[in-house]
């Protein structure tokens, strides 16, 4: 990853560009993905317990950032009818929002008006309450309903779902519900946390917390493979997924019984256009540092190069049939061995 700093490692992978100090450079991959057609979805870009960046793209592609289910309910639950403007007032407000006077044109040089109007449109959609119905995770939903299916897939107790909606599985369930109901085209999820185990808590906490996160990812993939879209095809057939961390932990145990930050890490990519069931690259047997590889074969090659975040971005986007111009100035190298022919 080229860094041992949490913020730098996270933002480097989110955008595919090395940060400017601690500040992200460029836009998140999910924002580029949503920018393909931001007007098509109610929530083009859903961001759950992680970061998101938009540098110069359509403001509608910016993520709806939430920490968890409680935030989602706050944003999407319908307004109190007593607080909604009367018809005449609502009409007048809309006319003001979309007026095209000289002031609006001057302000929009920096896209402020465009961004404000995009937010206004989303506020209208969210305030009506129709989107909330997809996330109204009630107790004991009707058998066979989408909510009941999500509970079963992610191991959520239907009798008391609220105790688990803040877990890794709960966050993955929210992502699955958004994607399979046509509400969004890009979701970023902070699946696991509490992994910065420098002390002897490593032995107990690292395994259980990673297992919870990986189980959520596995259940998500399984659910997408088993759930059909309106055309009768699995959602997984047109989906891509990437799982990463800020960096890895050192192979050696430190003097406190934990593991420190490590410069090399791994990443999971899967889905549309990706040739799975393989490991690309390897680490050295002596110090476990990453070895340079031939990107066309995935095999170690002293004349090759290390895999970098922009290479991962480019490969995943290429597999999905999308442009990877977002990292074109990073000289990305496609991992040809990871792409379906």
Tell me what each language-model feature is.
Residues 100-230:
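Anion-binding catalytic surfaces of enzymes that hydrolyze or transfer phosphate/sulfate esters
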Residues 3-7, 37-41, 167-171, 178-183, ...:
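Extracellular/periplasmic catalytic domains that process cell-envelope and extracellular macromolecules
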Residues 12-14, 42-49, 185-190, 240-243, ...:
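Structural recognition of the beta-strand scaffold that forms the well-ordered cores
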Residues 26, 30, 168, 309-313:
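A structural signal for well-ordered alpha-helical scaffolds and beta->alpha junctions
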Residues 194-341:
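Feature marks hydrolase-like catalytic cores characterized by long aromatic- and Gly/Pro-rich stretches
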Residues 34, 38, 77-80, 179-180, ...:
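Hydrophobic/aromatic-lined pockets within catalytic cores
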Residues 2-134:
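A contiguous, mid-domain pocket- or channel-lining segment that forms the substrate-recognition surface
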Residues 16, 20, 56-62, 148, ...:
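Surface-exposed intrinsically disordered loops and tails
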């Amino acid at each position: 990853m080229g860094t041992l700093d949490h913020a730098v490692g996270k933002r480097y992978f989110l955008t595919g560009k090395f940060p400017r100090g601690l500040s992200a450079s460029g836009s998140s991959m999910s924002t580029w993905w949503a920018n393909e057609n931001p007007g098509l979805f109610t929530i083009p870009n859903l961001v759950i317990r992680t970061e998101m960046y938009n540098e110069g793209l359509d403001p509608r592609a910016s993520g709806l950032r939430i920490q968890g289910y409680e935030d989602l309910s706050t944003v999407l639950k319908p307004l109190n009818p007593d607080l909604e403007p009367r018809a005449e007032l609502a009409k007048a407000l809309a006319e003001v929002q979309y007026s095209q006077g000289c002031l609006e044109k001057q302000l929009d040089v920096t896209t402020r008006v465009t961004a404000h109007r995009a937010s206004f449109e989303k506020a209208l959609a969210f305030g009506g309450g129709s989107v909330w119905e997809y996330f109204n995770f009630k107790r004991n939903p009707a058998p066979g309903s989408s909510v009941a299916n999500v509970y079963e897939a992610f191991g959520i107790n239907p009798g008391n779902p609220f105790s688990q909606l803040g877990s890794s599985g709960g966050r993955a369930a929210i992502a699955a519900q958004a994607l399979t109901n046509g509400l969004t085209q890009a979701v970023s999820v902070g699946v696991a946390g509490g992994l910065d185990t420098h002390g002897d808590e490593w032995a107990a906490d690292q395994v259980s917390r990673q297992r919870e996160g990986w189980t959520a990812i596995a259940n998500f993939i399984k659910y997408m493979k088993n759930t059909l879209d309106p055309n009768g095809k699995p959602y997984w057939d047109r989906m891509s997924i990437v799982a990463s961390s800020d960096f890895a932990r050192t192979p050696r145990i430190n003097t406190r019984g934990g593991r420190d930050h490590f410069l090399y890490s791994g990443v999971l990519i899967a889905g549309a256009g990706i040739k799975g069931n393989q490991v690309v690259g390897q680490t050295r047997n002596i110090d476990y540092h990453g070895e340079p590889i031939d990107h066309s074969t995935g095999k170690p090659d002293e004349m090759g190069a290390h895999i970098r975040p922009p290479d991962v971005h480019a490969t995943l986007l290429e597999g999905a049939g999308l442009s990877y111009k977002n990292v074109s100035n990073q000289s990305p190298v496609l991992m040809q061995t990871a792409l379906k022919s």
